[in-house]
UniProtKB/Swiss-Prot annotation:
A motif (Q motif) lies at residues 86-114. A motif (DEAD box) lies at residues 237-240. The gene is DBP10. This is ATP-dependent RNA helicase DBP10. Residues 511-523 have a biased composition (Acidic residues). It comes from Chaetomium globosum (strain ATCC 6205 / CBS 148.51 / DSM 1962 / NBRC 6347 / NRRL 1970). It is found in: Nucleus, Nucleolus. Residues 41-50 have a biased composition (Low complexity). Residues 66-80 have a biased composition (Polar residues). It is an enzyme of class 3 (hydrolase). Its EC number is 3.6.4.13.
Length: 762
């Protein structure tokens, strides 16, 4: 009988028993080894018979050896799958939260999530620097849900999220609802503009998570005398905007009422010096998390610096857009302009279905200016030139700001004109060009600006217009260059022989080692300095290279792979945080009323009629203008209107006695009556019908007379509607006001009918 060929593959725990079945196994051993690989030093017969070839001589040793091999392989497979899955499974989150993350569409954590979530799960205070769109909302919502897990029957909120605006609070509420599916956590939304009475009911329903703006939350805290000793998790979202909008006093008062054992998270796009002091006072040994991509210029960035006169900036800007970037005029292709009539008639769902383009065009350009007046001027100039432009600045209305940014995100416009304050926190995923119309005064601001392009391995261009006053600032950036080009405009070529040259002392400080071509520059030339950190960018041609072009080329060492990726700086401890925050701190000048870019804004004054002098508007909130103020628990002055007694009136109107305190068990009837009544309750977006009306009086000429009569009798017995105060229409005895109103109604009916009274028959 001819022997069957061996199987080409062996299972993991397979043992060759061919030697025991065939007598001529020794003769054909070499033939078998050609087809398959034999396990080394393993004989099935010796293992079963406890032969001499076994070291430990037993089945237990063989089984243990195979189990160890299986465990090693399973462990390696799990580590590979965890690494491949992106890290959410490796963070120790519960299965319910992982399913919610998958439903949300998160597969791989963003850099800020990957660095922040493990620290938050370790109960450490964190200061995170991240722009809008980087996933920072999920970075603090995911560990919050993991920590709270389920609704607590004990009274007291356990998490507070502070947002600077109503829109951001609604966005955070949406994320909390989506990631909190499958849990019974209660979330409330407390923002200005909503009814205080409804918010009283929401707070009385014992919520677990509070999402609020500082002004309204402080109002409710003072009005309801809230005890915040149960809070364990506090988040200040967009903290730089919180301070910019004037919530410093409210935040100080809220921070004083929180327990010292809380965990505090602070997220901000930038880190001004005032925010650093707040973090030092309110956080315990915080860790600073900031992305490496926001602290250095991308190696894929190409930079060009144009030295122009003050009157040529507008022309240079149009030249860059027309001839360098090749910006198309009008509305981008594929986008149809809608009339006001169509915009009023269309539905939101139809608009989203009609235009599914969620990213800017390949010509998308952002232009940075100094003040909001420059923003309006440049936007009007570019629109007059035929470009499609969006613009935003700090004091722009929130709704208009959202519309302008949305138009640029969806590709309806190619240009976005902004200031540094307005652009803070805005994240555009794909941005081709950045133009510095007004050069920034600090290198950090320059890196923050140009860091919006050349992301994810894509090429990007950064252009800067330099004047005589801003030329020294541009010299710091030009020291990083690897190529420098100098060329002249055609209109100024005839004046080359008669031009005057500036002395080195005027343009460069003593001891500054600059080349001779910088000493020969004049204001009548258009100088272009191109900085390239990588290969030449083929997609943009600045100008044809002239013959007399002076090129200084320096080969820069390639950046390591770990530096090209996104890293994060983690600093623990107060001393380390102060040192790291000193490097990351960046104060942006106000874009409204600044005398010059980079200079602090002068205090706005108003005329005080009582004292006949000018006083600062900054002191209007401390009671100097006549408004009644009270001292809070922290010592800061807050408005006396926060203690208006509306909560006591609401409690008496709803016939509520003493509400349970922090740590006591919640009342089921109280929770059932007031939960889900507002936009942030359990039934967010739905309102419960609570109005009670008594049935109409029975009509003896109708067929359902007896049914109606029975219902009216039940309403009188239960005192529903108009029978609430007893028998009769409203009360058993009518007041003089009721009688007067009834006579007025009767007189109006008589005048309306205008019929003469019937004469008695004689």
């Amino acid at each position: 009988m001819k022997r069957r060929a061996a199987s080409p593959a062996m299972s993991e725990n397979e043992v060759d028993i061919a030697g025991s079945l065939f007598a001529n196994h020794a003769d054909s051993d070499d033939e078998v080894q050609v087809h398959k690989q034999q396990p080394a030093d393993l004989d099935f017969g010796d293992l079963l018979d406890n032969g001499d070839g076994s070291d430990d001589g037993g089945d237990a040793a063989f089984i243990a050896k195979q189990q160890r091999s299986s465990n090693r392989k399973t462990g390696s497979l799990q580590s590979k799958s965890a690494k491949k899955s992106g890290g959410f499974q490796a963070m120790g989150l519960n299965s319910n939260l992982l399913r919610a993350i998958s439903r949300k569409g998160f597969s791989v954590p963003t850099p800020i999530q990957r660095k922040t979530i493990p620290l938050v799960l370790e109960r450490r205070d964190v200061v995170g620097m991240a722009r809008t769109g980087s996933g920072k909302t999920a970075a603090f919502v995911i560990p919050m849900i993991e920590r709270l897990k389920a609704h607590s029957a004990r009274v007291g909120a356990r998490a507070i999220i502070m947002s600077p605006s109503r829109e951001l609070a609604l966005q955070t509420l949406k994320v909390v609802k989506e990631l909190g599916k499958g849990t019974d956590l209660k979330t409330v939304l407390l923002v200005g503009g909503d009814s205080l009475e409804e918010q009283f009911g929401l707070m009385a329903a014992n919520p677990d998570i509070i999402i609020a703006t500082p002004g309204r939350f402080l109002h409710l805290k003072v009005e309801m005398s809230l005890n915040l000793s149960s809070v364990r998790y506090v988040v200040f979202d967009e903290a730089d905007r919180l301070f910019e909008m004037g919530f410093a006093a409210q935040l100080t008062e809220i921070l004083h009422a929180l327990p010292p054992s809380r965990q505090t998270l602070l997220f901000s796009a930038t880190l001004p010096s005032s925010l650093v002091e707040f973090a030092r006072a309110g956080l315990q040994e915080p860790s600073l998390i900031r992305l490496d991509a926001e602290t250095k210029v991308s190696p894929d960035l190409e930079s060009a610096f144009f030295s122009v006169k003050g009157g040529e900036k507008e022309g240079a800007l149009l030249h860059i857009l027309h001839d360098v970037i090749k910006m198309p005029l009008g509305v981008p292709e594929g986008i149809e302009e809608e009339t006001d009539e169509q915009q009023a008639r269309k539905r939101k769902r139809d608009s989203e279905r009609r235009n599914r383009k969620e990213k800017p065009t390949e010509h998308s350009t952002i232009i940075f200016t100094a003040t909001k007046h420059h923003v309006e001027y440049i936007a009007h100039l570019l629109r007059h030139a035929g470009f499609s432009v969006s613009y935003i600045y700090g004091s722009l209305d929130q709704t208009a700001r959202k519309i302008q940014v949305d138009n640029f995100r969806r590709g309806r416009t190619n240009i976005l004109v902004v200031t540094d304050v307005a652009a803070r926190g805005i994240d555009i995923p794909v941005l081709a060009n950045v133009i510095n119309y007004d050069f920034p005064p600090q290198p950090k601001i320059f890196v923050h600006r140009v860091g919006r392009t050349a992301r994810a391995g894509q090429r990007g261009w950064a252009y800067a217009l330099l004047q005589g006053t801003s030329r020294p600032c541009g010299g710091r950036v030009r020291r990083m260059r690897t190529q420098r080009w100098r060329m002249q405009t055609r209109m100024n070529q005839p004046l080359r022989k008669t031009k005057w040259t500036s002395s080195p002392e005027k343009t460069n400080p003593p001891g500054d080692d600059e080349e001779a071509w910088e000493d020969e520059e004049s204001e009548s030339e258009l100088e272009v300095t191109v900085t390239s950190s990588g290969k030449s960018y083929q997609g943009a041609n600045i100008l044809p290279r002239p013959r007399n072009l002076h090129v200084l080329h320096t080969i820069a060492p390639p950046a390591p792979a770990e530096e090209r990726g996104v890293r994060a700086f983690n600093s623990g401890g107060t001393t380390q945080f102060v040192e790291a925050a000193r490097d990351a701190a960046m104060d942006l000048a106000n874009d409204d009323g600044a005398k010059a870019f980079g200079l602090p804004t002068r205090s706005k004054l108003r005329w005080d009629k009582r004292h006949s002098k000018y006083v600062a508007r900054a002191n209007d909130d401390d009671g100097s203008r006549g408004a009644k103020m009270i001292r809070g628990e922290s010592g800061v002055k807050i408005a006396a209107s926060f203690q208006s007694g509306r909560f006591d009136k609401w409690r008496r109107a709803n016939r509520l006695g003493r509400l349970p305190g922090v740590g006591e068990a919640e009342k089921a009837n109280l929770v059932r009556n007031f939960s889900g009544g507002g936009p942030g309750g359990a039934g967010a977006g739905h309102y419960k019908h609570r109005q009670e009306k008594a049935p109409k009086d029975a009509d003896k000429f109708r067929d359902d007379y007896h049914v109606r009569k029975k219902r009216v009798a039940e309403a009188r017995e239960k005192r529903i509607g108009k029978y609430k105060d007893g028998e009769g229409s409203r009360r058993e005895l009518k007041s003089a006001t009721d009688i007067r109103k009834a006579r007025q109604v009767q007189e109006q009916k008589r005048e309306k009918n205008a019929r003469p009274a019937k004469r008695a028959k004689r």
